[in-house]
Amino acid sequence: MVYKSSKETQERKDLKKKRIIDTAFKVFSLKGYHGTTVKDVVVAADISVGTFYFYFKNKEDLFETLYDEGSVEFYNALCHSLVNINNEIDLGFSKAIAFFLSTIELNRPLAKIMFIDAVGLNPNFERKRAEVTQRYTNYTAGYFEQMKKSGKASIPDIKICSLAFIGTLYNVIMDWLQDTSPHGLTDCAYTLTVYNLQALKIDYKDSQVKEGINQILHKI
């Protein structure tokens, strides 16, 4: 019975911590990191200040938890998007880019926290951001290596080409997050796909590129 009670207590703690994190996500999304205070989160989550500090050391600790969870979510999206990139490469490339962009588009508040609010906060966050980029690049490099070996693409340097590919995604996402026009991020999927295919000298059919994008967007 002691074990059961301990387990139930831990589950309640985990649920409360998750509720604080979920609430903080909404507050950070509305006010940004610098505009949010611990009091804002406490009031929104309907908890005491003591409860907040039981789970988190300070606002930065809470934000770091959000950042880490967001990093995992977007990394998993990238991994999922690249799974079939080498199958019918023009179709696969377009599906990969469309899927990743659609994931970001559907999670714009989280993306804003990840790509904008976390920039330049402190050396620790800059290190985390660099590690995230490195994970993205390393994972992409595995698929680019397959492309190079199969002769499907012109890849003189796998690391540099992987960095460049991730860079095109990152810069388009950053522009979209700061853009006030109503266009969706997935509107960029076609141009971004064609640009990368041409940069890697990959033969493609325009119809295949459009078909791949449509297949992904129609599933959303």
What do these predicted ranges mean?
Residues 81-85, 114-118, 176-180:
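Secondary-structure edge/capping motif, primarily at the C-terminal ends of alpha-helices
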Residues 56, 116-121:
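Short helix-capping/turn signature of helix-turn-helix
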Residues 13-25, 41, 62, 66-74, ...:
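Generic hydrophobic, amphipathic alpha-helix propensity
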Residues 72-79, 123-149, 159-163, 171, ...:
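Amphipathic alpha-helical packing segments from all-alpha helical-bundle domains
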Residues 19, 27-61, 65:
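Helix-turn-helix
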Residues 9, 154-165:
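Membrane-interface starts of transmembrane alpha-helices
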